């Protein structure tokens, strides 16, 4: 018969084993001994469920199924960091620091872990709550999922009541193993460890979170001053004495030269780490100096994140494929030997056009250097010509469309070759994908794969056919069950009520982007009015130039377009502008009337396009750069140089929450 004393002893023993293994990377027992003691603990808990506490090691394995994630307000905001992209940015940061607090300074430099920012609350030394960063003010409660991370102690070495901040992440090995399993099971692969970590921590089934082998590094306390330390470096040391996992690769630097040396070292060595990093974080070490520097609305003035330049990696160019876009443009795509770049495996990359391939002398069979532009889109930079064997083949663009066989043409003043056959299947398919996309008709459940399936099965030949799809036909398709078909048809039905600009953009009229579609919809109000417009009328509208006007007139002169619009009308698709008209709005409603607004950083609740549409609906004009002519900057998380420039120019800065206050009452934008 087990007694409670033995139960408590087992908890302490297992906690120590976990600390040795997961925090200080110095295992003191074999796995078999750990497992044996865990089994003993589980048997006691089965016999005495009333003894089980939230900090029991058994809670690490998950098992709790959550109903959802509640909101958590951060007592102290979790601010994001301004970014530096080069030494000039760092020198500007250093100058601002010295101008304010003098030259007696030091920087604590830390690796910027590429994961998910989280907050952990301890009460009297016991783990109480864990939350995501969210928008910095309000996050989500992920207490149960964070409990499954073995390197997070359930009890601190001292009975402190503190809130610590850190970065939860998925180690490279765990990521690779997870994607191998998902591939075997036919599931979609995660793009990178950061996405995998974020997805894992938002699982409602804590067993899934526990199986993902996440880890964490802690790097701050909500208020280090509460711990009786005077510097950030002392604070990190204190976290370690409490049993929390802090990254060992930090370094105290006394000047910028030492900072540069640290950055150079880890730029070279980052690939050797067991986890992904995407930069280096500098923090003014003295806490009193931090207080003097203060913070902006979004970020501390005493810290900055240096972002690594895009990683460049060599690999083999196996082939060049040609893709036909919705406007007939032929785009060459590099087929590559799979290689890991900036946290993801890349097997395809953009080659842009034939002229660029010729200019760079890129040949099939070459070893090429690739990078991710902005760490997002892979592209081929150049061929490594010194590695050629002589077997490489120069690339020649074909004279005919790879899909329909029509002769390709190069229009005046254009670099790209085009297929101008309006019945080209590839163009129709791409046009359908564009029509249902988020910025166009925004039909949930109609992704690229479903569109291709519908097109291949001859269920749709143009966009109007989407609105006449039947439940019976959809249920015959592979992987289309009752629930998904019902949801899809409901989404198609709902899209019929979209405002005119969504439909106009979705139709894919050449040269007409989302902004021009909005201008046309506001001006003409109905599709019938727009159809009758001549070039002179069109060019009198802001955003509509001669080339676009010609394209619009040509489009509506086409009899096939008339037939398509009649079919859309028959389906009940709205062809009227239903959004706000500026002349009908009061001065109070037109908060951005005549103003230039810049969006920067990552938005948490609005998409970039929704934010842009909201600003325009309030009378504003959205610009891509900050200048003296900018009236307002809306800053999300990780806002970089644009935010810094706005502060220097004393331009008013809005948060995302400030902008959301002006959303329509129904909470959405047409």
Swiss-Prot record:
Its EC number is 6.5.1.2. The active site is at residue 112. Residues 587-670 form the BRCT domain. The keyword Manganese applies. DNA ligase that catalyzes the formation of phosphodiester linkages between 5'-phosphoryl and 3'-hydroxyl groups in double-stranded DNA using NAD as a coenzyme and as the energy source for the reaction. It is essential for DNA replication and repair of damaged DNA. GO terms for biological process: DNA repair; DNA replication. Its cofactor is Mg(2+); Mn(2+). Zn(2+) binds at residues 401, 404, 419, 424. InterPro entries: BRCT_dom (IPR001357), BRCT_dom_sf (IPR036420), DisA/LigA_HHH (IPR041663), DNA_ligase (IPR001679), DNA_ligase_CS (IPR033136), DNAligase_adenylation (IPR013839), DNAligase_N (IPR013840), Hlx-hairpin-Hlx_DNA-bd_motif (IPR003583). GO terms for molecular function: DNA binding; DNA ligase (NAD+) activity; metal ion binding. It catalyses: NAD(+) + (deoxyribonucleotide)n-3'-hydroxyl + 5'-phospho-(deoxyribonucleotide)m = (deoxyribonucleotide)n+m + AMP + beta-nicotinamide D-nucleotide. It comes from the Bacteria. NCBIfam families: dnlj, PRK07956.1. Keywords: DNA damage, DNA repair, DNA replication, Ligase, Magnesium, Manganese, Metal-binding, NAD, Zinc. It holds the Pfam family HHH_2. Belongs to the NAD-dependent DNA ligase family. LigA subfamily. SUPFAM superfamilies: BRCT domain, DNA ligase/mRNA capping enzyme, catalytic domain, Nucleic acid-binding proteins, RuvA domain 2-like. GO terms for cellular component: cytosol. It is an enzyme of class 6 (ligase). This is DNA ligase. NAD(+) binds at residues 31-35, 80-81, 110, 133, 167, 283, 307. It comes from Listeria welshimeri serovar 6b (strain ATCC 35897 / DSM 20650 / CCUG 15529 / CIP 8149 / NCTC 11857 / SLCC 5334 / V8).
């Amino acid at each position: 018969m087990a007694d409670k004393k033995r139960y408590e002893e087992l908890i302490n023993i297992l906690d120590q084993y976990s600390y040795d293994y997961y925090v200080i990377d110095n295992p003191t027992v074999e796995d078999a001994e750990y497992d044996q003691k865990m089994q003993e603990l589980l048997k006691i808990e089965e016999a005495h469920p009333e003894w089980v506490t939230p900090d029991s090691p058994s809670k690490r394995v998950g098992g709790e199924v959550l109903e959802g994630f509640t909101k958590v307000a951060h007592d102290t905001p979790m601010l994001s960091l301004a970014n530096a992209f080069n030494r000039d940015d760092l020198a500007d940061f250093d100058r601002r620091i010295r101008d304010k607090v003098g030259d007696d300074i030091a920087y604590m430099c830390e690796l910027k872990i590429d994961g998910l920012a989280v907050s952990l609350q301890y009460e009297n030394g016991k783990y109480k709550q864990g939350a995501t960063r969210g928008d910095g003010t309000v996050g989500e409660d992920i207490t149960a999922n964070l409990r499954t991370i073995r390197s997070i102690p359930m009890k601190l070495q001292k009975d402190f009541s503190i809130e610590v901040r850190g970065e939860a992440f998925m180690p490279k090995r765990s990521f690779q193993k997870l994607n191998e399993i998902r591939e075997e099971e036919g599931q979609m692969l995660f793009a990178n460890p950061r996405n995998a970590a974020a997805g894992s921590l938002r699982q409602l089934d804590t067993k899934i979170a526990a199986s993902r082998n996440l880890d964490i590094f802690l790097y701050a306390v909500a208020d280090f001053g509460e711990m009786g330390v005077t510097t950030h470096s002392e604070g990190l040391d204190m976290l370690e004495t409490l049993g929390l996992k802090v990254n060992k690769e930090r370094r105290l630097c006394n000047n910028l030269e030492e900072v540069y040396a640290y950055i150079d070292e880890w730029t070279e060595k980052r690939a050797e780490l067991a986890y992904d990093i995407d930069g280096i974080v500098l923090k003014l070490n003295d806490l009193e100096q931090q207080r003097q520097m203060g913070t902006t609305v979004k970020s501390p003035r005493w810290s900055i994140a240096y972002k690594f330049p895009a990683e460049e990696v060599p690999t083999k160019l196996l082939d060049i494929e040609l893709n036909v876009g919705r406007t007939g443009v032929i785009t060459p795509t590099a087929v590559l030997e799979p290689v890991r770049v900036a946290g993801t495996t890349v097997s395809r990359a953009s080659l842009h056009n034939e002229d660029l391939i010729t200019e760079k002398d890129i040949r099939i069979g070459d070893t090429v250097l690739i990078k991710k532009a902005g760490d997002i889109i892979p592209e081929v930079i150049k061929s490594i010509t010194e590695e050629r064997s002589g077997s490489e083949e120069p690339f020649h663009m074909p004279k005919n469309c790879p899909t329909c066989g029509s002769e390709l043409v190069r229009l005046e003043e254009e670099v790209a070759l085009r297929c101008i056959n309006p019945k080209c299947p590839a163009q129709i398919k791409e046009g359908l994908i564009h029509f249902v996309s988020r910025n166009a008709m925004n039909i949930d459940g109609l992704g690229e794969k479903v569109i291709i399936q519908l097109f291949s099965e001859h269920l749709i030949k143009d966009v109007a056919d989407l609105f006449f799809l039947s439940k019976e036909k959809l249920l015959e398709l592979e992987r289309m069950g009752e629930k998904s078909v019902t949801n899809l048809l409901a989404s198609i039905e709902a899209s019929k009520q979209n405002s005119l600009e969504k439909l106009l953009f979705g139709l894919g009229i050449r040269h007409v982007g989302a902004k021009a579609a909005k201008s046309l919809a506001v001006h003409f109000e109905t599709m019938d009015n727009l159809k009758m417009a001549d070039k002179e009328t069109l060019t009198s509208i802001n955003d509509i130039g001669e080339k676009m006007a010609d394209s619009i007139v040509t489009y509506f002169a086409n009899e096939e377009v008339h037939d398509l619009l009649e079919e859309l009308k028959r389906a009940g698709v709205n062809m009227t502008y239903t959004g706000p008209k500026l002349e009908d709005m009061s001065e109070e409603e037109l908060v951005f009337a005549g103003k230039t607004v810049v969006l920067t950083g990552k938005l948490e609740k609005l998409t970039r396009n929704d934010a842009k549409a909201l600003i325009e609906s309030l009378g504003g004009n959205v610009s891509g750069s900050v200048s003296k002519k900018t009236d307002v900057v809306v800053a999300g998380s990780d806002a970089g140089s644009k935010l810094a420039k706005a502060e220097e120019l004393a331009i008013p800065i809005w948060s995302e929450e400030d902008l959301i206050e002006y959303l329509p009452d129904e909470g959405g934008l047409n």
